[in-house]
Swiss-Prot record:
This is Palmitoyltransferase PFA4. It comes from Mycosarcoma maydis (Corn smut fungus). It is an enzyme of class 2 (transferase). It is found in: Endoplasmic reticulum membrane. The DHHC domain is required for palmitoyltransferase activity. The lineage of its organism: Eukaryota, Fungi, Dikarya, Basidiomycota, Ustilaginomycotina. Residues 1-22, 370-481 are annotated as: Disordered. It comes from the Eukaryota. Mediates the reversible addition of palmitate to target proteins, thereby regulating their membrane association and biological function. GO terms for cellular component: endoplasmic reticulum; endoplasmic reticulum membrane; Golgi apparatus.
Length: 481
């Protein structure tokens, strides 16, 4: 279950990547200036110098913080489930069956139980790594690569920006500068693929989701352990299901008659079937999804971002953009599980994933700055800093005519030299606020006034009733005598 902050940009309705920071202007030296929403809190000078070097490597190679009592309960339940499935099937099903079946030799028993116990050992070890390994935190003072945030523009576009900046130095040019990802909860920049987890109360590197069964976030430094844990759970549960089914079918008995299980065996067979079948179905489906994410090099949150981006492209809000982290099947798997296929399934192999979690390789044909520009922002979403809020003394949340939800799409416009009380009115389209960048019309657009055209006095429009099929219904009139 994912449990990240809704303000983090992971959900389609989130806006955290736009919160806290936005590009404001280009000065005469053509250097972007950054402004924060928390300047009033005394942080106006924080992280504005582009010459400050990036921070050191992230916090790695350390254990996570101690478990809380609720996390201890989740971990204990998980370990109890593994123990019940793993050991009850051996102690109360397979060993009694071995004792009363002469044809079931010790070599055959060892050939059945040794692989099963190796699978259990791999499950326990990978689960311990998932719980105790820190997913990765953003180092204090980290800053993005500022040169990668500036869009690649042609010479003509650059000359135009210089001319505009010289004429109006304070003109807002947000389209010319990309906003870096910023976490308003942590008051810090966010590296690519990192998100804020409100359960862990921090930004996690390459966050996939927060798993309550692990009592930990699945992130950059424990993602490989999580994939191996799912793999061994699937393989061992399937082996467990085949093993107890062989007992039910009496497959190890070379005699002709079937040896019926006793009452205790029957009870534990039912318990093992009741627990193993739901686990292998639920974890199996969950594993298939994460194996697919591994093949395309995406996280659970990034799959939501890709769906949101596809929706914006389909509606014409943004241009078609390529997902920057899909390197191909071979490179995608190597980036998570390690360089050699011989250690992909080895528990604990590749304890440290490739890279530091702050910067990632991108697909062919893309520049390194594409990872800082993913996911694309929705241009139709109003930025929170551009809203007009009422003063603290006002009892209303929005001042008059500033609520964006109640902004009508149609309004009445009056011609020049006329008052709103005049009976002569013209209806025209009222463009939504703010106007689209592709629309050449201004926000308040009135039709041009022709002085040679005399206004025509038209009577007021009479309200007309219409039936369910759209036909006009005459109003009721009194009976005439």
């Amino acid at each position: 279950m994912t449990n990240q902050d809704p303000d983090d940009g992971a959900y389609p309705s989130s806006q955290s990547d736009d919160d806290g920071i936005e590009a404001l202007a280009i000065n005469r030296q053509s250097r972007p200036l950054l402004a924060y929403e928390d300047q009033a809190a005394g942080q106006s000078d924080a992280f504005t110098d582009r010459d400050i070097p990036a921070s050191t490597a992230p916090l790695t190679g350390r254990r996570r913080t101690p478990l809380s009592w609720t996390e201890v309960i989740w971990v204990s339940l998980t370990l109890l489930l593994i123990a019940v499935l793993g050991y009850s099937s051996q102690l109360y099903v397979m060993l009694p069956y071995y004792e009363k079946t002469p044809s079931f030799s010790p070599q055959a028993l060892a050939a059945v139980l040794v692989p099963f116990n190796l699978g259990l050992l791999a499950i326990y070890y990978n689960y311990w790594l998932c719980v105790t390994t820190d997913a990765g935190s953003v180092p204090a003072g980290w800053q993005p690569e500022w040169s990668a945030l500036e869009p690649v523009a042609s010479l003509a576009e650059l000359e135009h920006l210089h001319l505009v900046a010289e004429e109006e130095p304070s003109l807002e040019l947000k389209q010319a500068i990309y906003r870096p990802r910023y976490c308003k909860t942590c008051s810090a920049f966010k590296p690519p693929r990192s998100h804020h987890c409100k359960t862990c109360q921090r930004c996690v590197l390459r966050m996939d989701h927060h798993c309550p069964w692990l009592a930990n976030c699945v992130g950059h430094f424990n993602h490989a352990h999580f994939i191996r844990f799912l793999f061994y759970v699937d393989v061992t549960c399937l082996y467990h299901l085949i093993m107890i089914s062989c007992r039910v079918l009496d497959s190890f008995n070379s005699y002709t008659y079937w040896r019926e299980p006793c009452a205790r065996e029957l009870v534990w067979l039912v318990v093992n079937y009741a627990l193993c079948i739901p686990v292998i179905l639920l974890v199996g489906i969950f594993s298939l999804y994460h194996f697919y994410c591994l093949a395309v090099n995406q996280t659970t949150i990034e799959s939501w971002e890709k769906d949101r981006t596809a929706t914006m492209i389909r509606r014409g809000r943004v241009r078609k953009v390529k997902y920057p982290y899909d390197l191909g099947l071979w490179r995608n798997v190597r980036q998570v599980l390690g360089a050699s296929p011989l250690v992909w399934c080895l528990p604990g192999a590749g304890a440290r994933m490739a890279g530091d979690g702050l910067k990632y390789p991108v697909a062919n044909g893309l520049d390194s700055g594409s990872q800082y520009r993913w996911p694309p922002k929705d241009p139709s979403r109003p930025h929170p800093s551009r809203r007009t809020w009422a003063s603290s003394s006002s009892p209303f949340t929005y001042p008059e005519r500033s609520n964006p939800i109640l902004d009508p799409t149609l309004s009445t416009r009056f011609p020049h030299n006329s008052s709103p009380s005049s009976s002569d009115s013209h209806s025209s389209l009222h463009l939504p606020h703010p106007p689209s960048l592709l629309d050449p019309l201004p926000h308040h657009f009135d039709p041009p006034h022709d002085p040679d055209t005399q206004p025509v006095n038209c009577p007021k429009r009479v309200s007309v009733r219409r039936g369910s099929e759209g036909y006009e219904v005459r109003p009721h009139t009194p009976w005439s005598v």
